[in-house]
């Protein structure tokens, strides 16, 4: 059985270790909060995939009903359940399969978010997750993922090597192909080989694509940023179009 990380240490490393690291990781939460406020997104019925310890709830208006789904590999879901044990409007579900979304009725959520999670999902399962999300969602979708291609990848690999941080192993050929965006030549393993452009296409196939934004520097194109944020909306049904 895989040993779960110490959650306090994990959060401290992400959000309290140096200004630069905190700025990078907080950018996605700040983006979601700002987008919800600016677009007046309805968050009354909120679904989150990869919720970890429920940190996003600290940055958005409180939903009337919130469902957080997580694989709980790192123990974050245990902490979320403990923190919200007395709040019946918050439901946390441990899940490793898109089949768990089958229990929800169609159009039962007004907003969906998934932060730094899609890159960890098996590519075959990701399609199934998006199919189910498109069914249960009648509203806005917000997804953030890391940028694992282009010149940014070379910078990230160099920084991780300098600071001695753990990183997915690339062959020299894979690193070259990833740096020029030839992701089909890179073996896929979680972050490694993940192509945000393919995810954008998958979302565009199922939703009305609103924007693709680079983070943390929104004035730079996504390919030159560390993180990519995708905003989309449920397509209008024939009934809504007729109305």
Regions found by a protein language model. Give the residues of each.
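S-adenosyl-L-methionine-dependent methyltransferase catalytic module, highlighting the catalytic core
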Residues: 3-27, 99-100, 122-237
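Conserved SAM-binding loop
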Residues: 32-153, 228-239
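Short, cationic low-complexity segments
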Residues: 243
């Amino acid at each position: 059985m895989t040993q779960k990380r110490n959650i306090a240490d994990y959060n401290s490393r992400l959000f309290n270790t140096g200004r630069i690291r905190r700025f990078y990781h907080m950018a996605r939460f700040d983006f979601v909060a700002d987008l919800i406020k600016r677009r007046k997104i309805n968050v009354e019925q909120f679904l989150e995939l990869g919720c970890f310890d429920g940190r996003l709830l600290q940055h958005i208006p409180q939903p009337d009903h919130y469902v957080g789904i997580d694989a709980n590999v790192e123990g974050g879901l245990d902490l979320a359940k403990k923190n919200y044990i007395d709040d019946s409007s918050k439901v946390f579900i441990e899940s490793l399969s898109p089949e768990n979304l089958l229990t929800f009725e169609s159009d039962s959520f007004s907003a969906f978010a998934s932060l730094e999670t899609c890159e960890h999902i098996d590519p075959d399962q990701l399609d199934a997750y998006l199919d189910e999300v498109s069914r249960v969602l009648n509203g806005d979708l917000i997804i953030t993922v890391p940028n694992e291609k282009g010149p940014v990848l070379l910078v990230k690999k160099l920084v991780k090597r300098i600071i001695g941080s753990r990183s997915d192993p690339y062959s020299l050929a894979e690193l070259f192909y990833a740096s020029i965006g030839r992701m089909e030549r890179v073996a896929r393993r979680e972050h490694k080989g993940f192509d945000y452009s393919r995810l954008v296409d998958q979302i565009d196939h199922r939703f009305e694509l609103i924007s693709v934004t680079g983070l943390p520097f929104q004035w730079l194109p996504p390919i030159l940023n560390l993180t990519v944020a995708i905003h989309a909306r449920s397509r209008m049904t024939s009934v809504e179009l007729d109305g």
